[in-house]
Each structure stands twice: as C-alpha cells, then as structure tokens.
Amino acid sequence: ACLNPGDEVIIPEPFYANYNGFACAAGVTVVPITSRIETGFALPPISDFEKVITKRTKAIIICSPNNPTGYLYSREEMEALKKICIKHNLYLFSDEAYREFCYDGEYVSAMHLDGLDQHVVLMDTISKRYSACGARLGALVTKNKAVYDAAMKFAQARLSPPGLAQIMGEAAVDLPASYF
C-alpha cells in the first residue's frame, strides 16, 4: 500500500541496519542522507532531503530516539519532516521503539503532528520498552485506511507470534507507569 519495487525511501544515516535489508527484500532503494557527528546527529537540513527527492521517492524513515545514535528529534525537526512529507506526498515511517529512552528533551510522536494523519505509519515493539528482546511482538499504527487495510490482509496471511510472547505482551502493557 505504501511502496512498490523500484520506489525509493530516504533515511537519515547512520540508521538501523535492518532497514536496508527490509528495503532490499521489497525491491525498494534506500537513499541515505548523512547526519553529522558535529551536530550530534541532528536531522540533516531539509535542503538535503529536497536534493534527493525524485518521482520515485515515496517515504522517509526515521527512528526517534535514533538507533544507533540515540538522537531525539525535536518538535521543530518533526514539524520540518511533516512539511516535506505533505509537500511531496510522502509517507513518514516512524520507528518509535525507543520512545521510553528519552533522557533529555521532549519526545514528539509522528502520530501527534497535526495534518499528517494520512502520511504516518508508526512502528513499535514491546521488546525495548519491556525488556522483552526476542519476543518479536510489535505494532504498526496508522490512520490511513488504505495502509491499514493492506496490513490487515498481510496479517491474515501471517502466522501469529508465539503464544508465550502474546501472554507476556498482554501482561506488559498492563504494567503501571512506575515500571519505567
């Protein structure tokens, strides 16, 4: 529903190495743009994004806080991403698996960016938040009905996560805020 073979996705680097493998398996080209250590790995300038956007560009992937750098995108950076996604009709795939690991600054979810509802696909997992690495239990969250419908078709064709992971996941989401 979001990407087809031959499409491109922009990712600020350094990035989670598996994004490259996932894209390759789908026939999608990763177009990296470099974030710099001198800026603490802040979001590269929007002009860098503009330079690499083509008619094949369909999405931007971010991870905030970033894996592997730990950089937390600011509200201003998230708003800049919103503007470019709307301007070019791009999806914003937001990996928010590390959202509990914010030590400085305000965590801003892509789902909370007004006007971006139809462009955001949030990816999350219990493995980081609840120290359940290996459980492979997560979520894809979107308000875009076409994306949701496509995900549900895929979900119907896929086997479920292991029973123990499901039981553990259900118990984990009921933990009190004091857990964190």
Name each model feature, range by range.
Residues 1-8:
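Phosphate-binding glycine-rich loop
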Residues 21-23, 84:
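Hydrophobic/aromatic ligand-binding patch that stacks against planar heteroaromatic rings
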